[in-house]
């Protein structure tokens, strides 16, 4: 169920990014512009909220992934989140994740919901230091590092 509140900076939510449209030959369509196109983010995944008050119905989020990209990690565009930082969830294993700051985007609150735990729903924010690392990684990914040096 979609959220009906303004999430806090650093809050962990689940986002349904949708999927790629498939053409008649079974391949992902790269010319259908009313949906996602590779390599854009897809599927249900955890996200970190960076701004929950864009307007009445939008948030800026950074998706979390269990796939490490050594190159982007070394370039400071991905931030490692240790396996014990995010509480145990029903549909997401407790494991190392990476905040993919190069995939930061604005999404509708209709795409966002609280992730399920075994006894309800997750209500958790990342530590401030980790959120600051993710924010710096977003700045690096948009090639604006000179603004903070």
List each language-model region with its residue ranges.
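C-terminal terminal-subdomain/extension
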Residues: 2-5, 73-149
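Short, Lys/Arg- and Gly-enriched loop/turn segments at beta-strand edges
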Residues: 20-31, 37-38
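Intrinsically disordered, low-complexity acidic/polar segments
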Residues: 24, 56, 70-71, 108-111
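Compact nucleic-acid interaction/catalytic patches
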Residues: 33-44, 49-87
């Amino acid at each position: 169920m979609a959220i009906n509140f303004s999430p806090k900076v650093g809050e962990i939510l689940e986002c349904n990014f949708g999927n790629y449209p498939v053409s008649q030959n079974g391949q992902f369509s790269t010319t259908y512009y009313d949906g996602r196109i590779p390599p854009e983010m897809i599927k249900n995944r955890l996200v970190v909220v960076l701004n929950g008050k864009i307007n009445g119905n939008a948030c800026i989020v950074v998706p979390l992934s269990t796939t490490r990209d050594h190159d982007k990690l070394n370039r400071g565009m991905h931030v490692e989140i240790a396996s014990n930082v995010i509480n145990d969830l029903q549909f997401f294993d407790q494991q190392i994740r990476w905040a993919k700051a190069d995939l930061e985007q604005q999404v509708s609150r209709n795409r966002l919901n609280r992730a399920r735990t075994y006894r309800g729903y997750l209500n958790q924010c990342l530590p401030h230091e980790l959120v600051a690392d993710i924010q710096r990684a977003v700045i690096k990914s948009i090639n604006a590092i000179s603004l903070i040096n």
